[in-house]
Each structure stands twice: as C-alpha cells, then as structure tokens.
Design a protein with these regions (language model features):
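Acyl-donor-binding surface of acyltransferase catalytic domains
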Residues: 1-22, 30
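Catalytic cores of nucleotide-enabled group-transfer and carboxylate-activating enzymes in metabolic
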Residues: 5-6, 34, 38, 75, ...
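Short, solvent-exposed beta-strand edge segments and adjacent coil->beta transition regions
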Residues: 21-24, 99
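A short beta-loop-alpha structural element at the N-terminal edge
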Residues: 25-37
Length: 127
C-alpha cells in the first residue's frame, strides 16, 4: 500500500505516559472483540469495510497478532470509540513492529484519542 504513512522510531524510551481525556479509558482486546473492532474501523471510514470474518482473516487470525497489542479506547460507559494495534515484526518479537490500523469514530474525533492510543501501543513495544 503505497499511500500508507511509514515512520521509524529508534527508541520508545521517551513515549509519554498515557493520559486520556476525562471520560475515557483504555482496554485490551478480549476474545470476541472482532465485531467491536470492525464497527470502529467501519464508522471511522477510509480503512475499508470489515466484517467479523474479515477481521479474523486479516488481523486476529494472523501470526503477527497478539491480544495484548490490540487496544481500545472506551468511554466510561464502556462504548469502544478508538483503536490501534501493535503489529509484531514477527510472531514472537516485541522489539520491532508497527502501529497498525488506527481509527477513531467521528463523534469522538478531535480529542487526541488517536495520539493516546498510539502512545499506548508504543508502550506495548517498550514494555
């Protein structure tokens, strides 16, 4: 995909601690979240159309996927509104990888949620 943004980061030592705005919190993927993830991606637009089956085929069923690396920002009412994934360099290497499939639903955009969920993904690689 030639139109994707690619950046390199030499170290994650200076990644800020995650400080979500009031009313939001962070959680990891749990088994069965494929529909939740697809809903966020579909509502955000521009990343394609996903079904639960496509999520399994392209994300959660892949060797580079690890459940601890798929993060969601939720409202305090447990509504998932943003996501990003720590996509491993290889199936067991946390030292390298990429921030994958970042999305925020339109109603919650403009609150820096993508910044904080990306920071959380970088913490996954660091920790």
């Amino acid at each position: 995909m030639a139109d994707q943004l690619k950046m390199r980061r030499r170290s994650n030592a200076d990644v800020p601690e995650v400080a979500l705005p009031s009313g939001y919190r962070l959680r990891h993927y749990v088994q069965g979240d494929e529909g939740v993830w697809a809903d966020i991606i579909n509502r955000a637009g521009a990343l394609g159309e996903y079904t639960e089956e496509k999520v399994v085929d392209t994300l959660t069923g892949q060797p580079r996927f690890h459940p601890e690396g798929l993060l969601f920002v939720t409202t305090d009412a447990d509504e998932p509104v943003a996501t990003a994934c720590a996509w491993l360099g290889t199936h067991d290497d946390w030292r390298a990888g990429s921030v994958h499939m970042v999305a925020v639903v339109p109603e919650h955009q403009g609150k820096r949620l993508s910044y904080w969920v990306c920071a959380a993904v970088l913490h996954v690689f660091r920790d």
